């Protein structure tokens, strides 16, 4: 086998086990989290697995392009984790090709350059202030590149299947709800009237129920009765909903920490990997 193939087969079971353990250690919370903290709880279990992959990538990069031997037991151990990875990637690709989101009354589409799309029938059913409130909410999604973040979150959740899928799914739902509440608050901060936005949310929910018997995952979360009530009550409360915006400093701190972790582990694999990683292949 090539060195990079051996590295991948060795990394898969170790990274997979660490991902499952980390996912089971991070508890899901039903609500009350800020969006940025809910996001951190969702993607944090990926850090140990990513570090392992970086370690083996450094080792593969450092070595010569020559055939490597690998014990049969290593291949057998890698198979179930390879199947989980293949399933997660297949579901991620399918979500990109799915047309379920196209039935949404209002949506933000595009992973790289998100754009706001409003269904014509939905727009006609709203007053001008209500339509502006909807556009303001969707523009908040576009500013934060939420379609890409939702896609990454769904992939991260699927990678925890099947041993830690329930906890990962609960964290995904908690983050998706916190995301909508944060974008509602951002729309109000940009001048949207809470009553107009609440009315538009109810109209959108009615349209989803009537025209999308099999809604997308995001639409199903948005249409959940208990969460819909929570959104409306927050908007119509005497005090405007105040969901703190994500801290740019905190976000960049997380990114820098992850980049440092991956850089350090890659360097360790690059410099010292030949001393101990080949022992795993015997």
Protein language model regions, located:
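Hydrophobic or amphipathic, alpha-helical segments that drive membrane association/targeting
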Residues: 1-103, 245-282
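Polar-ligand-bearing catalytic/cofactor-coordination segments
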Residues: 26-36, 73-150, 167-245
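Short, surface-exposed, polar/charged, turn-prone segments marking secondary-structure boundaries
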Residues: 144-146, 162-163, 263
């Amino acid at each position: 086998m090539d060195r990079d193939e051996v590295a991948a087969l060795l990394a898969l079971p170790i990274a997979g086990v660490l991902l499952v353990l980390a996912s089971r250690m991070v508890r899901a919370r039903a609500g009350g989290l800020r969006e940025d903290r809910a996001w951190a709880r969702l993607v944090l279990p990926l850090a140990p697995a990513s570090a392992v992959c970086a370690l083996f990538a450094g080792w593969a990069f450092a070595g010569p392009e020559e055939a490597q031997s690998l014990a049969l037991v290593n291949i057998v151990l890698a198979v179930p984790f390879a199947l989980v990875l293949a399933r997660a990637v297949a579901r991620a690709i399918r979500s990109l090709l799915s047309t379920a989101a196209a039935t949404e009354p209002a949506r933000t589409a595009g992973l790289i350059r998100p754009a706001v799309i409003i269904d014509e029938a939905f727009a006609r059913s709203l007053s001008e202030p209500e339509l502006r409130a909807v556009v303001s909410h969707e523009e908040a999604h576009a500013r934060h590149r939420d379609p890409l973040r939702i896609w990454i979150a769904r992939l991260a959740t699927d990678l925890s299947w099947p041993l830690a899928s329930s906890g990962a799914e609960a964290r995904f739902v908690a983050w998706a709800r916190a995301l909508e509440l944060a974008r509602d608050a951002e729309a109000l901060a940009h001048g949207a009237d809470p009553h107009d936005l609440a009315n538009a949310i109810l109209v959108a929910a009615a349209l989803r129920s009537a025209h999308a018997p099999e809604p997308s995952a995001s639409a199903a979360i948005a249409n959940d009765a208990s969460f819909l009530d929570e959104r409306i009550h927050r908007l119509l409360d005497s005090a405007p909903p105040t969901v703190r915006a994500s801290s740019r400093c905190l976000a960049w701190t997380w990114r820098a920490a992850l980049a440092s972790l991956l850089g350090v582990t890659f360097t360790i694999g690059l410099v010292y990997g030949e001393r101990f990683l080949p022992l795993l292949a015997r």
